[in-house]
Regions:
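Short beta-strands and strand-loop turn motifs
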Residues: 6-7, 130-132, 162
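Short, glycine-/small-residue-rich phosphate/pyrophosphate-handling segment
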Residues: 107-154
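A generic structural signal for alpha->beta connector loops
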Residues: 31-33, 124, 156-158
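Active-site donor-binding loop signature of nucleotide-sugar glycosyltransferases
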Residues: 39, 132, 164-166
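Conserved active-site beta-strand-loop modules that form the wall/rim of enzyme catalytic pockets
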Residues: 75, 128, 159
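Glycine-rich phosphate/pyrophosphate-binding loop and the adjoining helix
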Residues: 138-191
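N-terminal beta1-alpha1-beta2 submodule of the flavodoxin-like/Rossmannoid cofactor-binding fold
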Residues: 1-104, 169-191
Length: 191
């Protein structure tokens, strides 16, 4: 199986990008298939058009590729800054457009118009979230969004949150150590 690594940060000089790039490079050097989803680099449009919502599927090539890669991967790694106690808008748009029926879950209707039964499709996947915060903030809202909402709905049970807090208060050595430990944990957990 493959590893899907999603990055939601516009700055290629950011710590988020460094973790994204180094994690992917280590996994690729090991011979793993790595799907890189750099949302800003790919110019992903997070806004779901009305026709896509009504059609319940997307014709956007990024959405199709991202959904296929998510399905092919045994480990999903999402890397993002913590902005206002949550992920950036581009990443919320990724969830809205990718986590649809047929990719993250299926719906079964016994009769037209009845409430559907939801079947999770990601239950065999491992998920790692890497969030970086400038201040010392709680991880509670990130866990509530990612673990308890998005991935619980899709059946994921193997979930880990790596949350670097108070970047402003850390020196370069502390940040470097945290980055090295994060990349090590992400690449060790993949095997």
């Amino acid at each position: 199986m493959a590893v899907c690594i999603v990055l939601a940060h516009p700055d290629r000089a950011s710590l988020s990008y460094q973790i994204f790039h180094e994690t992917a490079a280590i996994l690729e050097a090991r011979g793993e298939t790595v799907h890189r989803q750099d949302l800003h680099g790919d110019e992903f449009d997070p806004v779901m058009p009305l026709d896509e919502l009504k059609r319940r599927m997307s014709l956007d090539p990024h959405v199709s590729r991202y959904a296929r890669e998510l399905g092919e991967s045994s480990h999903i790694i999402v890397i993002h800054p913590d902005w206002w106690a949550g992920p950036p808008a581009i990443l919320k748009g990724w969830v809205d457009r990718i986590f649809r029926p047929g990719t993250a879950y299926d719906e079964i209707h016994d009769f037209p118009g009845d409430d559907p039964e939801f079947i999770p499709l990601l239950s065999e996947k491992r998920v790692s979230i890497v969030a970086l915060s400038y201040r010392d903030v709680s991880s509670r809202t990130l866990k509530a969004f990612w673990r308890d909402t998005v991935f619980a709905w899709c059946g994921v049970k193997k979930f880990t949150l790596y949350h670097l807090k108070d970047i402003v208060g850390k020196n370069a050595n502390e940040i470097s150590d945290w980055k090295r430990n994060s990349v090590h944990s992400l690449t060790d957990n993949t095997m």
